[in-house]
Amino acid sequence: MCGIVGFTGRQQAAPILLEGLSHLEYRGYDSAGLAVREGDNLAEVVKATGKLRDLAEKTDNGNTLAGTCGIGHTRWATHGAPSVTNAHPHVSGNCIHSGSGPVESEVVGVHNGIIENYQELKEKLLRHGYAFYSQTDTEVLIKLVDYYYKKYRMGPIDAITKTMVRVRGSYALEVMFKDYPGEIYTARKDSPMIIGIAGGETYVA
């Protein structure tokens, strides 16, 4: 099982996300990543292979990533070998390396679980002009959310709902939308997720 966390509030998100991921560790993960955003700025994605401490060192314990809204992930490889490209977060845009640094993408997300019909969904998205850079089912899931978001223009909740209708599997999902700064959208099916609210700040794990 992978670990996913999210935070939006007044504090800097990255140190909180790293601490949250450390509490979820229970075996040897192969990679980790964060996506953090400050206001209307683009989300910035940082990934690292190896242990969570490698990501912490790469970001100076989160201090090099400015932003009060973000998501994080530790990966145990299922689809795709351990690599920076296969590490989460994944992005909806056709970005080389599947998103690193500031990303222009409409949707950035992390996911825990298995998408059983990801190959079928990937073929659908390829027909609609999407390109893929990782071997993960997560990249397919994020780009499917993007597809419905742009097709129906009805907002994040409707896009995620339509995605869940098409997806088979057990999963938990966290996504951020470029058009909705300071917000994290979550969904789950048969996978655990908890949301906590305290002092006007929101935590997800």
Q: Where do the language-model regions lie?
A:
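Conserved short alpha-helical segments that host acidic/polar catalytic motifs at enzyme active sites
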Residues: 1-205
